[in-house]
Every structure is written in C-alpha cells, then in structure tokens.
C-alpha cells in the first residue's frame, strides 16, 4: 500500500496524479479475467482449486471448500463481543431499511381496480465478499440482508481464504448472522466464474 502525505506543498501534485488515473483502464486485466473464467467453465472445480492455490496460497479441494458448522462455531469464539454486537445492530438497521423497499405485487386504485405485477424473489443468489488482507463484514451484511428481505431461498457466499485455508472469523460470523446458506472458501475471478 502506498501512503500519500497530503500537505499544502504536495496537495496539488497528488490530486492531479489521482485525477489522471482512468477508471476505465481495465484492458490489462480483462484478458486475464476472461481466461480464468473460461478455465473455470471448462475445468470447473479443479480450476477453482488451482487458482485458489495460485492466488491465495491455500490448498482447497472438494473436501474443505465449504465452510463447516465447526469452523463457524470456532469463528464465534474468536470474534470480540463488541464486534458481534456491532454486527447484530448493523444487521437490524440494514434489514429495517430494506424492508421499506419491498414491493407489493398488486395495489387497488381509487376506482377499485386491481393493478400490478408479480414481484418474485430469485431462488438462489451468489454473493462475493472480498477478503485476503482486508476484512469486510459490512459487505457481507450489505449483500446478504437485502437478499433475505427480498425472500431469496438460497444464498451462496464466496470469500477468499487465507494461506491456512481459513476464512476470517468476522466474515464468517457476519455471514452466519445475516443468513448465508452456504459459504465457500474461494475468491477472485474464479469465485465469480464458479458462481455464474
């Protein structure tokens, strides 16, 4: 990570350099990402395992890719009670917000005419939560809670493991609290390809 010290003397140069960066300059990555997704499409789980080893340094296989209830219980033991309270309070707030967005399928006009459209939740949703060196329990909540409120039946979450093959405890606790049905230890483009 590069740390920039913003002072009156450096402010102008730093801001100009930041503004020069193009948000649409993805050309160098697009080819690599497409190749990974194609490899996952063709070689399925084995490609996911290979890329997880290559990018995350973790030995993931069919026997350990799915987070177990034991791993979740262990995560609860490792998470500070203050963080758990914050996760639970945030979950309640996010849920209340999204409950106000739920659409009714039908409504009645002043004349008594029933109008509307059938609003139906998706059966399954895939949620990708970044991980690695940083931890994002808020991303877990902001993705899973709206899906739960919408009535999604099955929520599958992926997040990268550490080199030890484990997922950050706060990420697991947030996922359990939010209602993830399955959590897989895989990140990056290979996770997106597998979800698709």
Residue positions per predicted region:
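N-terminal Rossmann-like NAD(P)+-binding subdomain of aldehyde/semialdehyde dehydrogenases
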Residues: 1-122
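Positions that flank functional sites
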Residues: 55, 162-163, 190
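An acidic, phosphate/nucleotide-engaging active-site surface
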Residues: 114, 191-194
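Short acidic/polar active-site loop segments enriched in Thr and Asp
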Residues: 44, 153, 181
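A glycine-rich helix N-cap at a beta->alpha junction
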Residues: 171-191
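Conserved small-residue-rich beta-alpha loop and adjacent elements
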Residues: 108-173
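Glycine-rich anion-binding loops and their surrounding alpha/beta cores
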Residues: 2, 185, 193-196
């Amino acid at each position: 990570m590069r740390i920039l010290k913003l002072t009156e003397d450096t402010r102008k140069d730093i801001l100009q350099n930041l503004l020069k960066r193009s948000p649409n300059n993805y050309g160098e990555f697009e080819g690599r990402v497409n190749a990974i997704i194609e490899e996952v499409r063709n070689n399925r789980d084995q490609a996911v395992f290979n890329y997880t080893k290559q990018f995350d340094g973790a030995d993931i296989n069919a026997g350990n890719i799915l987070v177990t209830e034991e791993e979740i219980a262990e995560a609860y033991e490792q998470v500070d009670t203050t963080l758990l309270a914050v996760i639970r309070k945030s979950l309640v707030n996010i849920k209340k917000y999204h409950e106000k967005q739920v659409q009714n399928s039908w409504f009645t006009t002043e004349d008594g005419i029933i109008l509307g459209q059938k609003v139906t939740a998706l059966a399954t949703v895939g949620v990708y939560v970044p991980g690695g060196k940083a931890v994002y329990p808020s991303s877990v909540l902001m993705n899973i809670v709206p899906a739960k409120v919408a009535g999604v039946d099955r929520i599958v979450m992926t997040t990268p493991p550490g080199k030890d093959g484990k997922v950050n405890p706060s990420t697991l606790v947030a996922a359990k609290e939010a209602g993830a049905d399955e959590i897989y230890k895989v990140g990056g483009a290979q996770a997106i390809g597998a979800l698709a």
